[in-house]
C-alpha cells in the first residue's frame, strides 16, 4: 500500500477512534462543565504572545501559568516537548502514575486546512487522544486523559497530514486535593 493510502487509512482510523474519546479535548477558550479537562488559559494576552512566538518555551510558560492558576490540576512532571512539521513523536522521559493524567498542550499553524492527530503509544499499541480537522484560529488547546485509561504510554505520536506546524508539550498532572 503506498504512503498516501496508508495515511488516508490512518486518518480514517484515527477519526473512528476519536469517537471513543469524545469529551476529552477542548479548545483553550471553550468552557467545559465537568472539570475533568484542564482549565482555560487564564491570561489571554500571555496565550496570544506564546502563539506569536510559536516556541516550546513560550507554550510551556502558558501551560505552567494555567496549571498554577487553575486550582484544579497540579504539575507533576514534564514528559517531553517538540516543535513539529509533519509526522513526529515525543518520547516520554518518565512513566505516568496511573492515578494521574496525561496533559497535552499544543498550538498549531496551517497554510491550508488539513487534519492532524495526537496518539499515545505503548508497546506499539495506539490510543488516539484527538483528531482535528484543522487548527483552531490562533489558539492554544489542551487535552487530558486519565493515565488509568491508557497506562504506561511511552510516547505521543503526531500524525500530521498536510502543511501543519505544531508546538506540543506533554505533562503528567494530578488533581489538586484541597485539605
Segments predicted by a language model, with ranges:
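An anionic, turn-rich surface loop/hairpin at beta-sheet edges
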Residues: 121-149
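Short, surface-exposed beta-strand/strand-loop-strand elements in extracellular ectodomains
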Residues: 112-129, 170-171
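Short edge beta-strand/loop segments characteristic of extracellular beta-sandwich folds
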Residues: 93, 103-109
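Bacterial N-terminal signal peptides that target proteins for export
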Residues: 2-12
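Noncatalytic modules at the cell exterior or secretory-pathway interfaces
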Residues: 100-104, 146-165, 170-172
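C-terminal motif of bacterial Sec signal peptides marking the signal peptidase cleavage site
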Residues: 19-23
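Transition segment at domain starts
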Residues: 32-94, 177
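Extended, low-complexity, turn-rich repeat/linker tracts enriched in Gly/Pro/Ser/Thr and Asp/Glu
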Residues: 107-116, 162-166
Amino acid at each position: 500500500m503506498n504512503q498516501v493510502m496508508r495515511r488516508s487509512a490512518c486518518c480514517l482510523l484515527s477519526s473512528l477512534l476519536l469517537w471513543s474519546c469524545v469529551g476529552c479535548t477542548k479548545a483553550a477558550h471553550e468552557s467545559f462543565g465537568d472539570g475533568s479537562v484542564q482549565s482555560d488559559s487564564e491570561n489571554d494576552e500571555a496565550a496570544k504572545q506564546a502563539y506569536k512566538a510559536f516556541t516550546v518555551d513560550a507554550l510551556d510558560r502558558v501551560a505552567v501559568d494555567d496549571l498554577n492558576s487553575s486550582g484544579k490540576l497540579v504539575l507533576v512532571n514534564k514528559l517531553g516537548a517538540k516543535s513539529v512539521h509533519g509526522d513526529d513523536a515525543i518520547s516520554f522521559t518518565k512513566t505516568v502514575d496511573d492515578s494521574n493524567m496525561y496533559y497535552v498542550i499544543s498550538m498549531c499553524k496551517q497554510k491550508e486546512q488539513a487534519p492532524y492527530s495526537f496518539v499515545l503509544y505503548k508497546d506499539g499499541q495506539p490510543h488516539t487522544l484527538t483528531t482535528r480537522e484543522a487548527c483552531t484560529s490562533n489558539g492554544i488547546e489542551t487535552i487530558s486523559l486519565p493515565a488509568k485509561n491508557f497506562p504506561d504510554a511511552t510516547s505521543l505520536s503526531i500524525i500530521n497530514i498536510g502543511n501543519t506546524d505544531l508546538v506540543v508539550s506533554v505533562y503528567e498532572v494530578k488533581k489538586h486535593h484541597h485539605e
